[in-house]
C-alpha cells in the first residue's frame, strides 16, 4: 500500500483543524451513605444550600446539610437503584417549578409535573421555589375585601386581599369546606385560586378536584398535590411550589388566593426530614427552625404596591389541632405569623351549627379595613349580640326566671345563630348577605318561628329578586346603607313578612 506524505500531512492538518478544545468541568461527588430518602455525599466542595443535585436514574436531590466533610441531600424521587459509591453531579441551579397560565385548570405535583393525565404543561417559564418575601416598601395595606361567600366570616371575621387568615380546628370540623367555598365564591371575580394538598389521602384530593370541576371552579384553579404516599421532601416542597405559581400571577397585577391544606402535615414532613438529616430536635421533636419554615412561606403573601402592579396573594393556611388544643407548638406558631384566625369547634359542628365558627375567639386583625361600609353597618353589633346570647343561654339553662328584655335578646340570638348557618357549596353574594343580616339585626325576624328561618331567608331572596331587584344593585353601587336604602329594605322585608306569616 502506497501512502503519499502529502496525504498524511492533509489528514493530520484536517484532524488538527477539527480538534475540539471545549473542556467541560463537572463538579461531582460520591455517595457514601444512602437510606430513608437521605443521601450523604462526599465531594461537592462548592455546593449551595438548596441546590439541585443530579443522582443516577434521572433522580434529583436537594442539598440541605452542608457539613465539613459531606453534604446531606434529600431525594426528590425513588432511591431504587441508587447505591453507595455512585457518582452525583452538581446542577448549579436551585429547585424551580414551571409557572404560567398553562397551569390553570391542572393538577400537578410539588415539582410542577402534571398528574391529571391531560398531557404536559405547555409553559417555558420557571420560578425558584424559594423566593424572598416582598419588603415593606413593596407592599401596601390591605384595603379590598376578598369575599368568602360565608355569612359568618364575611360579617365578623372579614378577609382582605393580601391577608393571611388561619383556619384552625380539630379533624372533621369543616376546615377544608370553608376553603373550598371561598374558592367557589371567586367564580367570575378574576381571582386565580391555588389549592395545595399536603399529605392528604389521594382519594380526598380526587374528591376535591371532582367537586371543583363539577362546580366549574377548575377554570381558574391550580391544584398542587403532594399526597400521603409521597416522600417527606416532596410534601415539604409543595406549599413553596404553590406559592411560586401564585407569585407569578401576583407580579402580573392579578389577585390570587392560595390554600395550604394543611401546615400541620407540612411541619411533620419537615420534622421527618430534619431528624433523618440528624439535626437536633427541639420542642415536640420539631427542629429549631420550624417557625422560620412557616414564616418565610406566609410572609410571601402580600398586597403589592401600585408601582409593582398592585397584585395580591391571599393565603388561607389550615392547621389541625388535637382535642381543641391551640396551645400546641405548630398552632401557636402559625397563629402568631398570620393576620387572624378562624377557629372551628367540634362541639358547634356536632350541634348542627355549620360552619362551626367560634365567633368569640376568631379574629381578623386587618380585614376590618377591607370590609365594605354596608357590611360594617349591619355586622357592627353582631359579634356583641352573639356573645350576649351565649352568656344568656348558659344562664337560662338553670331555669331562672328571665325579664322581658333578656327573653327578647335570647329569641333574637337564636335567630342570629340560625341565620349564620349555611350549607356547604352554597356561597352567597355579598349583597344577599347584607340583606339577610340587616333583617336579622334590625329585629325583623323576631316574629318568625326559628324552624322557619331558613325557609324565610330563601323565599325573601326570591321575593326581592322579583319585586325589588334594584336593592341588590344599589348596595353594590353605593357600598353603604343610606337612609333611603334602609327604608326601602324595611318596606321590602315587611311586605314579604306579611305574606310569609299569612301562609304559615
From Swiss-Prot:
GO terms for cellular component: plasma membrane; proton-transporting ATP synthase complex. This is ATP synthase subunit alpha. CDD domains: ATP-synt_F1_alpha_C, ATP-synt_F1_alpha_N, F1-ATPase_alpha_CD. InterPro entries: ATP_synth_asu-like_sf (IPR023366), ATP_synth_asu_C (IPR000793), ATP_synth_asu_C_sf (IPR038376), ATP_synth_F1_a_nt-bd_dom (IPR033732), ATP_synth_F1_asu (IPR005294), ATPase_a/bsu_AS (IPR020003), ATPase_F1/V1/A1_a/bsu_N (IPR004100), ATPase_F1/V1/A1_a/bsu_N_sf (IPR036121). It is found in: Cell membrane. It is a peripheral membrane protein. The record marks 362 as: Required for activity. It comes from Clostridium botulinum (strain Hall / ATCC 3502 / NCTC 13319 / Type A). The gene is atpA. The keyword DNA damage does not apply. GO terms for biological process: proton motive force-driven ATP synthesis. Belongs to the ATPase alpha/beta chains family. NCBIfam families: atpA, PRK13343.1. It catalyses: ATP + H2O + 4 H(+)(in) = ADP + phosphate + 5 H(+)(out). Keywords: ATP synthesis, ATP-binding, Cell membrane, CF(1), Hydrogen ion transport, Ion transport, Membrane, Nucleotide-binding, Translocase, Transport. It holds the Pfam family ATP-synt_ab_N. One of its GO terms (molecular function) is ATP binding.
Amino acid at each position: 500500500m502506497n501512502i503519499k506524505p502529502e496525504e498524511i500531512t492533509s489528514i493530520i492538518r484536517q484532524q488538527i483543524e477539527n480538534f475540539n478544545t471545549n473542556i467541560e468541568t463537572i463538579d461531582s461527588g460520591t455517595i457514601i451513605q444512602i437510606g430513608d430518602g437521605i443521601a450523604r455525599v462526599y465531594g461537592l466542595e462548592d455546593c449551595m444550600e438548596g441546590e439541585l443535585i443530579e443522582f443516577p436514574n434521572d433522580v434529583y436531590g436537594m442539598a440541605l446539610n452542608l457539613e465539613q466533610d459531606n453534604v446531606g441531600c434529600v431525594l426528590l424521587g425513588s432511591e431504587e437503584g441508587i447505591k453507595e459509591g455512585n457518582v452525583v453531579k452538581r446542577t448549579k441551579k436551585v429547585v424551580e417549578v414551571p409557572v404560567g397560565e398553562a397551569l390553570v385548570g391542572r393538577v400537578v405535583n410539588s415539582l410542577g409535573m402534571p398528574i391529571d393525565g391531560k398531557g404536559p404543561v405547555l409553559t417555558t417559564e420557571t420560578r425558584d421555589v424559594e423566593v424572598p418575601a416582598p419588603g415593606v416598601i413593596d407592599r401596601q395595606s390591605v384595603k379590598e375585601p376578598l369575599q368568602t361567600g360565608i355569612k359568618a366570616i364575611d360579617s365578623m371575621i372579614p378577609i382582605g386581599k393580601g391577608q393571611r387568615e388561619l383556619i384552625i380546628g380539630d379533624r372533621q370540623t369543616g376546615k377544608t369546606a370553608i376553603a373550598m367555598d371561598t374558592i367557589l365564591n371567586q367564580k367570575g371575580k378574576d381571582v386565580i385560586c391555588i389549592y395545595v394538598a399536603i399529605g392528604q389521602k389521594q382519594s380526598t384530593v380526587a374528591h376535591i378536584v371532582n367537586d371543583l370541576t363539577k362546580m366549574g371552579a377548575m377554570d381558574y384553579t391550580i391544584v398542587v398535590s403532594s399526597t400521603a404516599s409521597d416522600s417527606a421532601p416532596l410534601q415539604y416542597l409543595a406549599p413553596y411550589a404553590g406559592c411560586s405559581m401564585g407569585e407569578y400571577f401576583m407580579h402580573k397585577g392579578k389577585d390570587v388566593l392560595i390554600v395550604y391544606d394543611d401546615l400541620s402535615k407540612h411541619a411533620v414532613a419537615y420534622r421527618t426530614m430534619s431528624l433523618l438529616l440528624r439535626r437536633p430536635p427541639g420542642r415536640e421533636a420539631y427542629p429549631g427552625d420550624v417557625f422560620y419554615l412557616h414564616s418565610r412561606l406566609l410572609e410571601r403573601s402580600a398586597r403589592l404596591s401600585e408601582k409593582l402592579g398592585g397584585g395580591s396573594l391571599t393565603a388561607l393556611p389550615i392547621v389541625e389541632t388535637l382535642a381543641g388544643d391551640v396551645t400546641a407548638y405548630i398552632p401557636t406558631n402559625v397563629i402568631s405569623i398570620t393576620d387572624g384566625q378562624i377557629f372551628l369547634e367540634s362541639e358547634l359542628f356536632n350541634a348542627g351549627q355549620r360552619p362551626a365558627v367560634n365567633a368569640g375567639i376568631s379574629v381578623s386583625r386587618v380585614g376590618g379595613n377591607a370590609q365594605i361600609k354596608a357590611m360594617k353597618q349591619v355586622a357592627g353589633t353582631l359579634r356583641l349580640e352573639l356573645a350576649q346570647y351565649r352568656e344568656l343561654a348558659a344562664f337560662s339553662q338553670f331555669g331562672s326566671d328571665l325579664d322581658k328584655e333578656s327573653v327578647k335578646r335570647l329569641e333574637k340570638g337564636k335567630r342570629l345563630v340560625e341565620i349564620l348557618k349555611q350549607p356547604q357549596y352554597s356561597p352567597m353574594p355579598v349583597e344577599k348577605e347584607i340583606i339577610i343580616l340587616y333583617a336579622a339585626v334590625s329585629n325583623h325576624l323576631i316574629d318568625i318561628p326559628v324552624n322557619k328561618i331558613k325557609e324565610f331567608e330563601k323565599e325573601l331572596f326570591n321575593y326581592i329578586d322579583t319585586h325589588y331587584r334594584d336593592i341588590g344593585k344599589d348596595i353594590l353601587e353605593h357600598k353603604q346603607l343610606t337612609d333611603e336604602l334602609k327604608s326601602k329594605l324595611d318596606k321590602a322585608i315587611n311586605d314579604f313578612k306579611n305574606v310569609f306569616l299569612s301562609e304559615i
